[in-house]
Amino acid sequence: MRLILPADTEGIFLERKSRFTGVALVEGKKTLIHIHNTGRLPLLKKGKRVLLKRAESDRRKTGWDLLAVEHRNEFVFVHSGFHSIVAGKILEELFPGSTIESEKRFENSRFDFLIDRRTFVEVKGCTYEEDGVAMFPDAPTGRGRRHIEELIRSVKSGFKALLLILVFLESDCFLPNRSVDPAFSEIFWRALNSGVNIDVFRVKYDGEYLCSTEKLSICEEV
């Protein structure tokens, strides 16, 4: 998978003002930027280099969108608004010739994709790691737990289900983040044992392209 998404400029991150806004030094000026990610993003620290894309609308209070933040000699893509686009490209390669529909409803939930009317897909983006282990979530996520519960229910109803996890930073393998959200970790393993397929893909960003480089394994839980 290769998706072109060039950054428009580079800046220096200064602070996170709220859930969706931050301040960065852009072209020598303190500038309000939009952070399209509801996670805690612990790697987003003062002084870090960031890649930004100019906002398409002049009516917004924030003139720039945060795309990526520097972390250990690479840029980690943090804009969750592109997760579905990246996932769609990966699914096209995983299921060539299949019909892939987006935003499909099952009972009281809406999943990211439905493949050939029989496989529901939910996508999660991971931007946190410890000692080479990618972990999700970086903050408690009731919504994430509900999505996986619904994937399990879809399997019990005769569908197939896939949890697709996109890891955006250098990692050796993946684990659910038990220390941050024990309930999510519990339901993750329950899903794996209930017939939900879980695929983890490493996605790199170089300021020009998003590229899916390899499939990661699920670590052995200690």
Swiss-Prot record:
Highest taxon of source: Bacteria
Please name the Pfam families in this protein's record.
Answer: SfsA, SfsA_N
Molecular function GO terms recorded? DNA binding
Write down the HAMAP family for this protein, in alphabetical order: SfsA
- Name the protein family: Belongs to the SfsA family.
Note the PANTHER family from the entry: SUGAR FERMENTATION STIMULATION PROTEIN A
Name of the protein described by the UniProt record: Sugar fermentation stimulation protein homolog
Name of the gene: sfsA
